[in-house]
Each structure stands twice: as C-alpha cells, then as structure tokens.
Amino acid sequence: MSAHGDPKPMTARKGGALTGTAEVPGDKSISHRSLIFGAMAVGETRVTGLLEGQDVLDTASAMRAFGAEVAREDDGTWSIHGVGVGGFVEPDDVLDCGNSGTGVRLLMGAMATTPISVTFTGDASLRSRPMARVTDPLALFGTRAYGRAQGRLPMTLVGAEAPMPVRYATPVPSAQVKSAVLLAGLNAPGETVVIEAEATRDHSERMLAGFGAQISTEVTQEGRVITLTGQPELTPQVIAVPRDPSSAAFPVCAAIITEGSDVLVPNIGLNPTRAGLFETLRDMGADLTYENPREEGGEPVADLRAKFSPDMKGIEVPPERAASMIDEYPILSVVAANAEGTTVMRGVKELRVKESDRIAAMADGLRLNGIEVEDGPDWWIVHGRGPGGMAGGATVATHLDHRIAMSFLCAGFASQQGITIDDSGPIATSFPIFEPLMRDLGARLDRANA
C-alpha cells in the first residue's frame, strides 16, 4: 500500500505525441541540503524553487525539531533561521523521515557530533534499508547507535560529546555516506577527510563552500580526497534551487520513446556528477539537445529538448558512469526496451538496496510486459524490441518506490496495451506534480480506482 494511505493504482496508455514544456520540480538533493545547511548556519537562509515533495517536507520538519525556524512564505520562498554548527537541540519526539534515505542519512550526520539523542524511523521501505553504512563511519567520531539487527530503523543515535575528526575511505560510492561524514565533521575540531574511489554527486562540497566552510578537493592515487576543517561559522545564503535532473529524466525519456513527441524541459541542473543518464541517452542515439547552457549558483544548467528517437541502439553503459546516474537506471531500462538490440548495465549493486531492490523490480515488471531481461548481483541486461515493441497489458508492483512507479507509467505511454502500476502514491515523495505535468504534455493516465 501507499506510504500515506490506501494504494492508488494508475494505468498509462498509448495516446498521442507528448508535446510542450515540462516544468519539473526543484532538485531533491539540493533541496535537502539547503534546509540542513541553512539550519546549521547563523542567521536567515532564503531558498526559492525548493522541491515540496514529502521527502523534503520531512527534512524541513526535522530541522524544526532540531530548533531551527523553518517557514514557507506565501510566494513559495522558504526561510530558515539557523542555530549554528553544534546548536541543534534534542527533539521532543521520534523523527519520521518517511521514505527518504537521503534525508535520514544526512540528518544522522548533522546531529552525530552534537551531544543529543535522536530516534529515527521511516516508512516500511526505509525501515528495510541498511543504515550501518552511515552509522559505522559516524562511530569513528564517537557517535553511538542503537537499533534493530543489520542496522535498520527504528534507530537511536547518541551524538559524540567530545568528537574527534576522522579520515574515512568510503567502501562503496555513496554521496549520502560522504555527506553524512562531512556533516558530522562540521562540529569536530581539526580536519575531517573523506576519500572516495569513484566520484559521486558533489552538491555537499559545492554548497558547504558557498556557506563559508573551509573545504577542498583533490584527486590523488587514492581517489577523490575531500578535506573539511571543522567548527566553522556557516554564513546564511540565498539559494535558487535548480530543477531536478532525476525528475527531468521522466518527461525526457517518455518523449524519446513516444512517437511524434517533442518536449522542452527548462532549467535543468547538469552537474557532471548527475548527468550520466543524458550522456547515455545520447550515446544510444537519442535526439536530446542542451539549449541555452549557463551557470546558476555554481551549478551548470541548461534547457533540455527531447524528441521521439526511433533509431536508438542498445549499448554497454560504462560502469564508471553508474554513480552519476544511479537513480536513473530504472527509466533507462524502459528506454532500452524501446531501442534495437541489447543494453548492458554493470556495476550497479547499489540498486539492490534503494527504496526497493530496483534491479528485481524493473526486471520483473519488464518481463511481465513482454521484454526479455537477464540480471545478476550487480548487473542487468535488457533485450530491446525497438520502438513501440513493449507489449504491455500487465500490472506491475512498485514496492513503495517512486522511481519504479514513474518508470512503468512512462513505459505505458509507448506500450501496445498500456501498463498499470499497483500504487501511484509514492510518486509524491519526489515528484508531486508528475501526473498533471504529464497530462499537460498529452499523456494518457487513468486512475484505476477512479
């Protein structure tokens, strides 16, 4: 069932071409960080373009629980009056992070070096996800964690009373783990160092520098080395959140596979640590162009124009690209199903521990709808059937995963018999306007229980 009530089945069917402009929401990663860094600054941070999905709203509630003043103004601007690094107060109640792995892991890092106790929980999906990957490095600071077996929520963290800086090499590429360690390092004296063998999204580093933290990055034989000097006074900022490339992926890919389509998706953040999907689509032969490239708030931005692309070919996606598109593999597999030939995706074991086991969820759903898929522990292969080659006709289990839900709805627009998902409710966690936005482009969506 949906995280917020009864299941909401929905069916996507083949209709006409998708045309027009898709104004997708603000970037989820930057929205979370804007609230958290604003709460750790001294003074008022103002944010426009914040994603108002449930995940981010849960983070806003957590910042209030930690003592920051967080308010949405009538014009949509968000105001955060921060309490300073180390200034968080102990919440009166359990922090419910809903479906947000990003939210809970960043919040754990943010409080880990302040001597308070915080209990975290979430929905059924979040409670099944591993948290030891975050609590293990936080323990190096002196943070203590008490929770269920295998490091799962609900979990109580007790912040370190006398935190020490750490040097930590991330065992798997994870921007969430890296960011949690950097956030903890803010309130530890001296230099905290994070080493990552593969570069992951660098919004935390860019934004911390913007808030006045002393942070540097260099590439060495060990990998990418990020050094943060602890106990700064963060300076409040005015932030314009760029549009989310992970949300843009859905109208872009839907246009590419739906006959006659031509869709413009403006103001999309194209941080190189996030743009792997768009590079991959172009490698496959998609008609995808970047218009009006520019820089806003330290982030590269462009308008994306996506058109129906009937001549796409399957490719082997470079494994080193995985970190820059880890959330986009589900929708890429839908595009691959509508390309000619075989698409191979390797080095993606992280997909097994997302909101759902995304490899299993996508493989099962694609097979039900007539696509041949092979999969293993950290790889999967989609055998494409060409434009409009997906039979459809099946109902797919979304496993409370917003990206699985949206991926199969996009698949339905180009399928022969339509595709039904068992629950559209989770879409609200990251893309609350998905349904009206796609309808405005001409998509055919039916609420199965309407």
UniProtKB/Swiss-Prot annotation:
UniProt pathway: Metabolic intermediate biosynthesis; chorismate biosynthesis; chorismate from D-erythrose 4-phosphate and phosphoenolpyruvate: step 6/7
UniProt-annotated location(s): Cytoplasm
SUPFAM superfamilies given in the database record: EPT/RTPC-like
Residues involved in 3-phosphoshikimate binding: 28-29, 33, 174, 176, 327, 354
EC number: 2.5.1.19
Residues bound to phosphoenolpyruvate: 28, 101, 129, 176, 358, 403
GO BP term, example: aromatic amino acid family biosynthetic process
Top-level lineage group: Bacteria
InterPro entries associated with the record: Enolpyruvate_Tfrase_dom, Enolpyruvate_Tfrase_sf, EPSP_synthase, EPSP_synthase_CS, RNA3'P_cycl/enolpyr_Trfase_a/b
Keywords of the record: Amino-acid biosynthesis, Aromatic amino acid biosynthesis, Cytoplasm, Transferase
Residues at the catalytic site: 327 (proton acceptor)
Subunit architecture: Monomer.
Family: Belongs to the EPSP synthase family.
Stored PANTHER family: AROM/DEHYDROQUINATE SYNTHASE, PENTAFUNCTIONAL AROM POLYPEPTIDE
Chain's role: Catalyzes the transfer of the enolpyruvyl moiety of phosphoenolpyruvate (PEP) to the 5-hydroxyl of shikimate-3-phosphate (S3P) to produce enolpyruvyl shikimate-3-phosphate and inorganic phosphate.
Protein name: 3-phosphoshikimate 1-carboxyvinyltransferase
